[in-house]
Amino acid sequence: MSNNDEHEEHEHEEHVHDEHVHEEHVHDEHEGHHHGHEPPNLEPEQHREQGVVLFNSVWEMLDMEDRTPAQDDQMVHAAHASRWHWSQAGELGGDQQLAVGEWQCSRVYSMLSRGEPALHHAQACLAICQASGLSDWVEAAAYEALARASAVAGNAGEARTWLARARTATAAIADPEDREVIDNDLAAIAVLPILSDG
């Protein structure tokens, strides 16, 4: 899940480039006196579009060989923003998008070697899958995220347990391309020093 082709396989979503979404600037009768910042009222379709755009932008940053600390922070914010926009998309969103949003947040934190938040979002991803009956590649991705986050957190035993569950779930994925994506991720986890040295 570290290149554009893999993103499309996981999301099955088109890149959305909306050049016609404009925010109106609202000025009250006391211009110059700000009484707080109200979030713009976006339509569900606009939330969906922002969720997709931000999701793809996170992948672009994950694919960068060298990121600055500022870019790391931007990547974290974009992942959370994407997840939030999907939660506001109504019927255009759904449990799968929410689970994948949590999965991406976990991947971002794992890439930044931040085990605790990586585990938190991986657990949230699995919880959504279990509560909504999601299976196939989404469930396998949740186990993959838990294995990766556990390894990052320094818990080799937990990482191996989740890795085994991820392999079982991955073997049951219907689409061979989706199965290959998860298999590649699991192979990368298996050779992490904390696991390959044990």
List each language-model region with its residue ranges.
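Histidine-centered metal-binding segments
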Residues: 1-39
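Residue signature of alpha-solenoid helical repeat architecture, marking inter-repeat boundaries
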Residues: 45-53, 73, 93-96, 137, ...
